[in-house]
Amino acid sequence: MELTWHGHSTWHVVVDDTELLIDPYFDNPKTDVDPEELDPDYLLLTHGHSDHIGDVDRYEGATVVATPELTGYIQENFGHENAVGGMGMNIGGTVECGDAWVTMVRADHSNGIDTGYGTSAGMPAGFVIGDKKPTQESDPDCTTFYHAGDTGLMSEMVDVIAPYLEPDAAALPTGDHFTMGPAGAGIAADWVGADVVFPMHYDTFQPIEIDTREFVNEVKAAGAAAEPVVLEGDETYVLENEFGSDGD
């Protein structure tokens, strides 16, 4: 599984022959990529704020993976014809997306659409992406990535996401102000039980500027087993599980 961070909360995930793009927003200082170079099969949207759906119009051909409310808005306003299940999905559901399985999980945040915040986009969400369908039986050959969306600390991280979905890697919002900051992200790194954790949703604009060394220190202070990794913009991390498989 290949994970590329394009700044803010935008991630390009490759699982075998399937490409997924999460929260496309390329108007951020961490990326130099030309958005037109990406051709995702699936467009995963955690919520409707403009810094998470800012570039959805570039990917009309992708299948939308979002709540029914946000899916309907995207289809009506940007012309996307395809959506998982024809109408989107909701918290707790798992859908097959090509070679990947995507589970929608809860996030604690607000969720108006665009900058007016006048239209409901349903519940905010996070996603757990795996190369196998999650079951109650632990599968050491499964590789999983947790994108937390915009959120603060929540008990679901330790009660549901860690024991059931068992993420190998997690991307955690770290910029504070609108989400949890480095201290909260450090605790989250411990709670989700991942092997590696990445900071995201920081340094895009003034209220969320941080020193990423704080994130690294807070992960260690929390006693998390995870390795904190601070990616450069547009950098790719190849995720392998503990048995050396990257899901191929």
UniProtKB/Swiss-Prot annotation:
SUPFAM superfamilies: Metallo-hydrolase/oxidoreductase (SSF56281). Signal peptide: none annotated. GO terms for molecular function: hydrolase activity. It comes from the Archaea. Keywords: Hydrolase. Pfam families: Lactamase_B_2. Belongs to the UPF0173 family. NCBIfam families: PRK00685.1. This is UPF0173 metal-dependent hydrolase Hlac_1347. The lineage of its organism: Archaea, Methanobacteriati, Methanobacteriota, Stenosarchaea group, Halobacteria.
